[in-house]
């Protein structure tokens, strides 16, 4: 069978289903693929079992089960993630294994918001999922219109509580199972949901359009030409003649100009996100730059020591710690290309963290690193990974 050509003319977004166990996330995922396929003949209609039997993947040593499906509307192409278990969501969202530009929060109209509904909204807030659209599922099981309105209000309040715009979030009422069974009235609700997703979740900015940043992996001197920093461009573009800042691991940021860009020993005019390059830097001595720093467009990212982070602590089975840790625990925090020691403070009322838990903690590093909300890191101890985290807010 010939492979279908990937249509680049459509914009692309990554989304996922979130919500409490058994509220219908996987059924909804199956319904979206099925209903859209039926209409356009594009994509693949997936059955519940095909999605539910997601294989385990290992992302940075963490075992996660995730189902990846794709489908398209008239306006956009979507990559959609759905996870079988609550723990898989926690790991997925914290490690960034599944980047989400937006999420569909599935809430059973028959049950209303439940503990994991709240936890997934909090996680979305902390790991930087920017937009949420709500699907009230199982509405065929609720005869009372007032009850539906009550559940909708509860969900909106919950979203507002975690700083999402609860009053403006689109809420679609439907039944994933009925849509999957081909009930026209409920198929229409799937189209309504996807129209809301198309409209409400903006097309993400491409990595190449963001401000330039490159983590420094290695540094060497070329006699007579100067100092070269090598690494993979994480975002944006850099051109010969651009001014950049060297950030992190030192008191002052240093500004310099890129006088040459090389890739595979060839000289380039510019490099962009994804390229592995060497950047020749004017007037920078070998001692003034080191692995673990970043090169960035001036003023776009700043060095910090203290931040809040959402962290998943690896279980013993995943090769993590066998024992809990407490406040003042001092492991290494691995940011991009280097380890920095940091001190952990647990939230008030939390005495210790067990392997397999997730928690929001405060971290203070011993030296500054270029970080921002959404920067991901690993926690390491003697070279092995014991946790995975994402910066949820900068303190100083």
UniProtKB/Swiss-Prot annotation:
Domain of life where this protein originates: Bacteria
Region (G1): 19-26
Catalyzed chemical reaction(s): GTP + H2O = GDP + phosphate + H(+)
Keywords per UniProt: Cytoplasm, Elongation factor, GTP-binding, Hydrolase, Magnesium, Metal-binding, Nucleotide-binding, Protein biosynthesis
Gene this protein is translated from: tuf
Entry-linked PANTHER family: ELONGATION FACTOR TU, MITOCHONDRIAL, ELONGATION FACTOR TU-RELATED
The protein's name in its UniProt record: Elongation factor Tu
Family stated for the protein in its record: Belongs to the TRAFAC class translation factor GTPase superfamily. Classic translation factor GTPase family. EF-Tu/EF-1A subfamily.
Organism encoding this protein: Bacillus licheniformis (strain ATCC 14580 / DSM 13 / JCM 2505 / CCUG 7422 / NBRC 12200 / NCIMB 9375 / NCTC 10341 / NRRL NRS-1264 / Gibson 46)
């Amino acid at each position: 069978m010939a492979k279908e050509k990937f249509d680049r003319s459509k914009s692309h977004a990554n989304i996922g289903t979130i919500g409490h166990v058994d509220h219908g996330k996987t059924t909804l995922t199956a319904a979206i693929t099925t209903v859209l396929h039926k209409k356009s003949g594009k994509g693949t209609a997936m059955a519940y079992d095909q999605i539910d039997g997601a294989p385990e993947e290992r992302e940075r040593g963490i075992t996660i089960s995730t189902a990846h499906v794709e489908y398209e509307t008239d306006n956009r192409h979507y990559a959609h993630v759905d996870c079988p278990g609550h723990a898989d969501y926690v790991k997925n969202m914290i490690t960034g294994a599944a980047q989400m530009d937006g999420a569909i929060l599935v809430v059973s109209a028959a049950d209303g918001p439940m503990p994991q509904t709240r936890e997934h909204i909090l996680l979305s807030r902390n790991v930087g999922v920017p937009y949420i659209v709500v699907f009230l599922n199982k509405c065929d099981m609720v005869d009372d219109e007032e009850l539906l309105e009550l559940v909708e209000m509860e969900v909106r309040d919950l979203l507002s509580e975690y700083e999402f715009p609860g009053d403006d979030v689109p809420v679609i009422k439907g039944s994933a199972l009925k849509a999957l069974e081909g009930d026209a009235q409920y198929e229409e609700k799937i189209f309504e949901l996807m129209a809301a997703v198309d409209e409400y979740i903006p097309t993400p900015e491409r990595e190449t359009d963001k401000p330039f940043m490159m983590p420094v992996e290695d540094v060497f001197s070329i006699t007579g030409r100067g100092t070269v920093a090598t690494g993979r461009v994480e975002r944006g573009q850099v051109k010969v003649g651009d001014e950049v800042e060297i950030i992190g691991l030192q008191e002052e940021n240093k500004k310099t100009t890129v006088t040459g860009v090389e890739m595979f020993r060839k000289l380039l005019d510019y490099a962009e996100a994804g390229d592995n390059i060497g950047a020749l830097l004017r007037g920078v001595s070998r001692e003034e730059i080191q692995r673990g720093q970043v090169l960035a467009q001036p003023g776009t990212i700043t060095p910090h020591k203290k931040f809040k982070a959402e962290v998943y602590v690896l279980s013993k089975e995943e090769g993590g710690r066998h024992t809990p840790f407490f406040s003042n625990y001092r492991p290494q925090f691995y940011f991009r290309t280097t380890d920095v020691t940091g001190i952990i403070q647990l939230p008030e009322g939390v005495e210790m963290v067990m392997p397999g838990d997730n928690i929001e903690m405060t971290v203070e590093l011993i030296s500054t690193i270029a970080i921002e909300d959404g920067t991901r890191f690993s926690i390491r101890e003697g070279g092995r990974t014991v946790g995975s985290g994402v910066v949820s807010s900068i303190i100083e």
